Amino acid sequence: MFGFIKKVLDFFGVDQSEDNPSETAVETTDVSTKIKTTDTTQEESSVKTKTVVPTQPGGSVKPETIAPDQQKKHQIKTETTTSTTKQKGPKVTLMDGHVKQYYFARRGETSTHDTSLPPPVKVLSGRSIPLKEIPFEATRNELVQIYLTSIDKLIKSNKLNSIPSQQIASHYLFLRSLANSETDGIKKNQILSLAKPLGTYLASKEPHVWKMINELIEKSEYPIIHYLKNNRAHSNFMLALIHEYHKEPLTKNQSAFVQKFRDSSVFLFPNPIYTAWLAHSYDEDSSFNPMFRERLSTNFYHSTLTDNLLLRTEPKEVTLSSEHHYKKEKGPIDSSFRYQMSSDRLLRIQGRTLLFSTPQNDVVAVKVQKKGEPKSTLEEEFEMADYLLKHQRRLDVHSKLPQPLGQYSVKKSEILEISRGSLDFERFKTLIDDSKDLEVYVYKAPQSYFTYLHDKNQDLEDLTASVKTNVHDLFVLLREGIVFPQLADIFHTHFGEDEREDKGRYQALVQLLNVLQFQLGRIDKWQKAVEYVNLRSSGLADLGDSLPITSLFTSSDFTKHYFSELLTGGYHPTFFDKSSGTANSLFTGKRRLFGNYLYLNTIAEYLLVIQLTLGSYGDKVTRDMMDKPKKEAVWRELANVMFTSCAEAIHIMTGIPQSRALTLLKQRANIEKHFRQTQFWMTPDYSKLDEDTLQMEQYSIYSGEPEYEFTDKLVSGVGLSVDGVHQDLGGYNRESPLRELEKLLYATVTLIEGTMQLDKEFFKQLEQVEKILSGEIKTDANSCFEAVAQLLDLARPGCHFQKRLVLSYYEEAKLKYPSAPTDAYDSRFQVVARTNAAITIQRFWREARKNLSEKSDIDSEKPESERTTDKRL
């Protein structure tokens, strides 16, 4: 079969290594100095590794999309220079060490980030009690061992006939999957010995179930993934068995784990199986729905998926080396420049910035120091604008960036005199500092730079293009290691800000950062929050409001100010031990991972700001519309823009094609519900409805879910509002009513992080396979083919390139063991080979049609006598 497919490919003469234009195979030769590995203390140089590297336009490697345990070898932007072919292997490319440029934003993982973290403590009754940090993985393993003991007790009790066959099937398939993930031969045989009686029982008593089980085993080394994906389990079969047969009390940490992750057995799965299941759970044919618990209670648990995933990770390795562009290429500030301000050329005042016209139809902006603002803030904005202008092409930044002109001191009296005639003069006076001499930052920018993204004068087409630019640049720069933590002033509350741990700042993934929160909270004065948003029609603005990504991963001023409790681990469920005077908690392990949590929170925060901005635009444009279908059309299109923005973020961060990412997101969040919920809650229309009509409307926007409950009195013409003037998203001390947005945010960040972790497992297994094939690890033929089959299970769903790479290893294994039986694996790899052949043939014909079209266009421009058209009869 494989020989025939190869002949087909050879006949068409197509390079098999490039069926997917967004991905490329790379064999790297790192000839640099020794690089510290991300998962051990070992040092290595001159490392050659096969890998699959998603690329940016132009061929530069995206470091964060490479497998985390391989990224130490791919912190570079490379140009392909040499090709080489391995026998029976994929076509590969060598990276030239002379042209590589280092990224500082590594996405590998390390043992820790910051040795200066404050000690883990829990404050009880004003007393700081030390917290004993108990790793997540240790507790998970303990519960799996208890489960295996319970299985043994079940078998010895001879009560299999009292358990539904579907549950026995779940146990059997999990044991087979667990055994296949086990590297210790003795433990593997012990697990298989537990599975054998279950299989014997099903084969004799439930032949139809046994047939289904065998079909799943033929398809995958981890058959439990596909069983759970296609069969909705109505209980946690592992915990149910533990409760039935484990009579000893669980430890406090085991109980905490069970309480937190009781909704699905997948939360107890080993890392390779969990990450593979998580990726497959987004597939269109998946019956898994994370919106509600299986008990159909009102609590969402999609955040639990993300939490369980993150607790399995190691801190992301992020450094800001001194030789990086960000450190060494910020230009000097021009303090000698002076701009001659004139009231005749003053266009308007925007916030604390004076805008002046120019003959070239651009705008010169004079940004004035605001109250309490240090001079360094304006300096940072100058430097960042200068840096991004210099590296705009390298970074692929699409925004129309401002051109910094100078920064210097001006008399406050001069500024007031020039601006006195403006309509916004009084507000301007309250914003600027009280000093006699004020620092100003002067820059030139296009007029669109001063048009906020929610400006109602834009049509939907222009808005969509502007949103795309902003989303692209936010995530491209996040990849580069530049974070914008103040895109908007989003607050959960303005009451008692200083006394709160979060200072009132809104947390987009609050369920992960605060154990007492189960859903997103109310957003205070949501339109006010994005009134001066740093997203403009031209792209990103106010570039000084940025931080290096290292600020998220260390106990920086930023993290200590807004996330102080996260750094100590003291906000988790804690168990006090009076005998020792200490406390312990399963979740204090988060303290070491706080940067990983804040990283995903930043992604969600960016997208939340996009949604609020779209909502502000929608309210302004449709508020006076009387045509209901036309009004709905606007909000429906805005919902499409939001979903597309999330898909674009996934594409930039992982390399997954945007169209596929959008399809996957729609499996987790309902775009129709999202459109109805945003239209309902982000306009004041609902404030005019009577109680019965309001309830009926909620049946529509929350179909299949409980309605949104609030006790606040609606303010006429506003809606839910604490201050009675500005609309809030949610009632006081209540959750956010935008439930589909919450699902969308979690679906996005989970897909991003889940893909990275799946890649980590894929490349870890790939190294194992290479060592087996090279003879470095001695094993038999069956173990070799089993290892290659496991690699196929860890390939990204829908990523044909990774699967084709695994196919090449399978062919190498068959060459290494030519007489070994492979019937158990051939059917899986024949599917990969057929898909590969189909893609290659389709690509060939696409290229042929494209070349023919281009040739026809060229011929049409030539004189008739020079045309190459065949004139034969």
From Swiss-Prot:
Residues 16-90, 851-873 are annotated as: Disordered. It catalyses: L-glutamyl-[protein] + L-glutamate + ATP = gamma-L-glutamyl-L-glutamyl-[protein] + ADP + phosphate + H(+); (L-glutamyl)(n)-gamma-L-glutamyl-L-glutamyl-[protein] + L-glutamate + ATP = (L-glutamyl)(n+1)-gamma-L-glutamyl-L-glutamyl-[protein] + ADP + phosphate + H(+). The keyword Glycoprotein does not apply. Its EC number is 6.-.-.-. GO terms for biological process: proteolysis. Residues 22-58 have a biased composition (Polar residues). Keywords: Hydrolase, Ligase, Magnesium, Metal-binding, Multifunctional enzyme, NAD, Nucleotide-binding, Protease, Thiol protease, Transferase, Virulence. One of its GO terms (molecular function) is protein-glutamic acid ligase activity, initiating. The keyword RNA-binding does not apply. Its cofactor is Mg(2+). Coiled coil: none annotated. Mg(2+) binds at D542, D545. Glytamylation catalyzed by SidJ requires host calmodulin and can be regulated by intracellular changes in Ca2+ concentrations. Also requires ATP. Interacts with host calmodulin/CALM1; this interaction is required for glutamylase activity. Glutamylase that mediates the covalent attachment of glutamate moieties to SdeA on one of the catalytic residues that is required for its mono-ADP-ribosyltransferase activity. In turn, inhibits SdeA ubiquitinating activity. Also glutamylates related SdeB, SdeC and SidE. Glutamylase activity only occurs in the host since it requires host calmodulin. May also reverse the SdeA-mediated substrate ubiquitination by cleaving the phosphodiester bond that links phosphoribosylated ubiquitin to protein substrates via its deubiquitinase activity. This is Calmodulin-dependent glutamylase SidJ. The lineage of its organism: Bacteria, Pseudomonadati, Pseudomonadota, Gammaproteobacteria, Legionellales. The gene is sidJ.
